[in-house]
């Protein structure tokens, strides 16, 4: 089973540091941003320490790593041409960096229509993806299932299907299935994950799922809020998430935790990563809330 988390990529070690961090959590895969998700400042590809990072990954069985595109990309924006243009150009450069890292999946929030309506936003996303995918790289864009917060597009399987169907080179598109987002969008993954997966299969095809984001949710189903919670501590719950992680149709897919860091009881500003504990729980199929509580000190 491929199970890991979001890790940082920074400093001099860059990819090597990412692999070391993932190893410390007991992971065998991981997800990274190639720089800060809030801006376009990026180190040169030559400074990502790729060779040493890949060597460490090989030595420790790290495979199927995933890149996440930055939040600032919004190719669904019909109101500001400069925002759309930045999104297309920067996504193309991020795909180039993803290929250099030898990752095959870059996760993308499809975009927000900023008031123009979902149909207009989806049309703009299709336009942007058609331009981005005109350049050939061995990388798929994994469109993420969204919670429906604000004017997000991709809040339903139907919206994602419409985007995929409209893109010319849609063999270069995949899907990142986020448990928190899907739950918050209204899908009953707690009581009927197989039914949800069957619905996805009919509209898009389960074979399109190439990344799973495994997150609990702070919100009730259908809240359209997108607030992640630690595994077993939210409205989805451990049993449902454990079922997803061990689902026979999804075994070969990298599963990435994006759960919140745990604040210390003595100092809320100091926080600990929960990933080692959560990976241990999911690998053993045993909910151990005391592991998370222990992180509070």
From Swiss-Prot:
Keywords: DNA damage, DNA repair, Endonuclease, Hydrolase, Metal-binding, Nuclease, Zinc
Record-listed E.C. numbers: 3.1.21.2
UniProt-listed Gene3D superfamilies: Divalent-metal-dependent TIM barrel enzymes
Cofactor(s) needed: Zn(2+)
Molecular function terms from GO: deoxyribonuclease IV (phage-T4-induced) activity; DNA binding; DNA-(apurinic or apyrimidinic site) endonuclease activity; phosphoric diester hydrolase activity; zinc ion binding
TM annotation in the entry: none
Positions that bind Zn(2+) 2: 144, 178, 213, 258
Chemical reaction(s) catalysed: Endonucleolytic cleavage to 5'-phosphooligonucleotide end-products
Keyword RNA-binding included in the entry's annotation: no
Claim: Zinc is one of the keywords in the record: yes
Matching InterPro entries: AP_endonuc_2, AP_endonuc_F2_Zn_BS, Xyl_isomerase-like_sf, Xyl_isomerase-like_TIM-brl
GO biological process: base-excision repair
Sites where the protein binds Zn(2+) 1: 68, 109, 144
Highest rank taxon of the organism: Bacteria
Residues engaged in binding Zn(2+) 3: 181, 226, 228
Cofactor note: Binds 3 Zn(2+) ions.
Pfam families: AP_endonuc_2
Family: Belongs to the AP endonuclease 2 family.
Function, in words: Endonuclease IV plays a role in DNA repair. It cleaves phosphodiester bonds at apurinic or apyrimidinic (AP) sites, generating a 3'-hydroxyl group and a 5'-terminal sugar phosphate.
Name the record gives this protein: Probable endonuclease 4
Species this protein is from: Lysinibacillus sphaericus (strain C3-41)
Organism ancestry: Bacteria, Bacillati, Bacillota, Bacilli, Bacillales
Chain's gene name: nfo
